[in-house]
Structure formats: C-alpha cells, structure tokens
Swiss-Prot record:
Domain-related comment: May contain a beta-propeller domain involved in specific binding to phosphatidylinositol 3,5-bisphosphate (PIP2), leading to the association of the protein to the membrane.
InterPro entries documented for this protein: PROPPIN, WD40/YVTN_repeat-like_dom_sf, WD40_repeat_dom_sf, WD40_rpt
Intracellular or extracellular location(s): Vacuole membrane; Cytoplasmic vesicle membrane; Preautophagosomal structure membrane
Keyword Repeat in record: yes
Reported consequences of knocking out the gene: Impairs atg8-processing.
Organism whose genome encodes this protein: Schizosaccharomyces pombe (strain 972 / ATCC 24843) (Fission yeast)
Main subcellular location: membrane
Protein name as annotated: SVP1-like protein 2
Length: 364
C-alpha cells in the first residue's frame, strides 16, 4: 500500500490531491470518488496542488525516493502526462498555497510570492522562521489574505493583497514556535497553535485582535490540523493524542451547550491529589467556568489514529478526516436535547453532543 505524504484541496474544495510515494491520486470530495491517478516508477511526491478542476497540477518531489529535487516546483499537465514548466529555488520547498493567479511557496526561511501565468513572475520575497512550511491563503472578490509564521518565533504575519496595494501586520500569537495554522472561508478569522499544543487561539485577521482562545488540554502534544466550519461557528482541532476537539466560536449558546453534569475533562485528572477536597473543588469551579465561556470542547472524539493529514468540513456538521495510511472517515456531528435539566447558575436547556460514523474506507 502506498504511503500518503500530504493531502491538499483545490481552490473551491471540490477535489483533493493526494501526494504518494508512488505518484498521485485526485478525488472528487462529495461524494468521494477517484477522478484521476498517476503512478511513477522513478520516485514520489511530497506535495500535489490542483488548479480548480483542470488538468494542471503543481508537484514537488518527496518521500523516500523523490521524483524531483525538493527545491523544484513542477507544473504538470495531466492530459499530456508531462511537465510543462518548472521553477528551481535555492531552498527546499516545504509548503504551497495557490489560488490560480497567486502562488505562495513556503521554505524554512522565506516566503516567495509569484504571479502564476505563462511565466512565473516573482512578486515578493519575505523572510520567515518557518521550518514546517506553514502557509494559509484565502481569496475573495476584494482581496487575498495570506498568513504564515513571521521572522520572530511565535509571531504571525498577515498579508492582505488588493488590486493596487498590500497591507501587512504582525500578530504576537504564541510564546513558542507556531505548529499549525487555519484560516476561515472568508479570511476574517485565523486559528493558531504552538508546539506546546495546549492552547488554540483565534484571531481577527484584519485587526490582529484575539477573538478567543480554547484549551485543548493540559498535556503538551502536536496539533496537526485546524479547520473552521463553513459558517465559521465551529473550529475543529486534531492532535497526535488521537483526538478531535470541536469548539464553538460563540461562547455557549443554547444550540451548542455542553452537559455540565458529565465527567470532568480527562486532562484535568492530572491535577487530582491526596490533599483532596479544596484542590478538586478548585478545578471543578474552573472547569465550569470554561464551559460557561465556551472554552471547553463541545465534541471530543477519539480518532482512528494520530496525526491525520487532512481535516475538512463537508458542510456545517460533517467532517472528512484522512490519515497517512490512506484510511479516511466521515463523521456527522449531532446535538440532541437531554431529558434531564441541570441547575447551574440558571435553569437552561441542556444538549448532548455526539456523532455518527457515516463512512470509512481507504484512498489507496
């Protein structure tokens, strides 16, 4: 079975490209269906990006035996079955963002912006501190928003590209290195996490202000995927703890409430001690405050395995998860009204948060 290196979406999220040690596969997302595939006998790929639903793909060599040097970007025509253009950099390519007209190439120390057309014309080159090649891009009618780690550890740099000018800002997001980024469909919100993996922070991309923050847990771990729901009301977070956390971005409205009577969040159990009652009471009060402020995950789901390579919302309540071993799951989130009422501050309607497994299978 082929190993998946990365999975990426096309510009309208109607298709996904799977980079393999043996080539690539292109899938229609909803319903999930294989549309094209190419197997290479001489090496694998680390990145595959599709231009909308066309035959044009961007390829970067990778895996155990790279087909191309990792500092080369290949523009591939799937109909002609050959490269039609290539771009060679002095740095290994770590990540790519592409909206059809603007191409952002992330390396460990630089972000290159190219105009995509008959010729790849360099527009800008910015210094970064970005060992993972993190980069997120959204293009609307008015502008293009790009976010990536800045030169200083823990900072985000946000670019807004308009037709006639560019705005840029720096956000001091975390104390340690940024490990994961997400951007909302409109580009108005940015999600970030650091290598600690305990806090997820949401930012207003235009003002740089922090909208809210969520605690994934108290144990350090790597957050590998962050994704906003299409309506930007929920944020999904997947980590190497083999868990999927889903938070509400609007506190705890009646339609998205957590049962206050359920067992405490498992990470809090680390703080239990033999000094007993005062300590436990303190953490119980703290957890209830987290629930009230919406900072506790409404859904906490055990994943098939750790470190998924794609987390994508198919609609406001359905999530597609793809894993490195080519397995995938489709989860439908549910909210059911509880039969019991709980007294906490004021009487309120309680809801139970659950999910159903709609589909699972393999991409290879």
């Amino acid at each position: 079975m082929s190993t998946i290196n990365t999975v990426s979406l096309n510009q309208d999220a109607s298709c996904m490209s799977v980079a393999l040690d043996t080539g690539y596969k292109i899938f229609q997302i909803n319903p999930l269906k294989l549309r094209a595939q190419r197997q290479f006998n001489d090496g694998g790929l680390s990145i595959v990006k599709m231009l909308f639903r066309s035959n044009v793909l961007l390829l970067v060599g990778g895996g155990g035996n790279p087909k191309y040097a990792p500092n080369k970007l290949i523009v591939w025509d799937d109909v002609k079955e050959r490269p039609v253009k290539e771009l060679e950099l002095n740095f290994e390519i770590k990540g790519i963002c592409f909206d059809g007209k603007l191409l952002a190439i992330a390396t460990a120390s630089k972000l290159f912006l190219y105009q995509f057309g008959n010729n790849l014309k360099l527009q800008r080159c910015l210094d970064t501190q970005n060992p993972k090649g993190l980069c997120a891009m959204v293009t609307t009618v008015e502008k293009t928003a790009i976010v990536f780690p800045s030169r200083k550890v823990g900072q985000l740099q946000i670019l807004f590209l308009f037709k006639d000018h560019m705005n840029t800002s720096i956000v001091p997001a975390h104390d340690s290195e940024i490990s994961c980024l997400g951007i909302s469909k409109t580009g108005s919100k940015i999600a970030s996490s650091s290598t600690n993996g305990t806090l997820i922070r949401i930012w207003n991309s235009e003002t740089g202000e922090k909208i809210c923050e969520f605690r994934r847990g108290y144990q350090h771990t790597a957050v590998c995927q962050l994704a906003f729901s299409p309506d930007e009301l929920l944020l999904a977070c997947a980590s190497k703890k083999e868990t999927l956390h889903i938070f509400s971005l609007h506190g705890s409205p009646n339609t998205i409430r957590q049962l206050t009577s359920e067992e405490p969040y498992e990470e809090a159990s680390e703080f239990k001690s033999s000094t007993t009652e005062p300590r436990q009471t303190h953490w119980k009060r703290k957890l209830l405050k987290l629930i009230d402020s919406g900072k506790r995950a409404h859904w906490r789901i055990q994943l098939y395995q750790s470190n998924p390579v794609l987390l994508h919302w198919l609609d406001e309540m359905t999530i597609l998860i793809c894993y490195k071993d080519a397995a995938y799951q489709k989860l439908k989130l549910t909210i059911e009204e509880s039969s019991k009422s709980v007294e906490h501050a004021n009487q309120h309607v309680c809801f139970h948060y659950d999910y159903t497994l709609e589909a699972d299978g393999s991409l290879c």
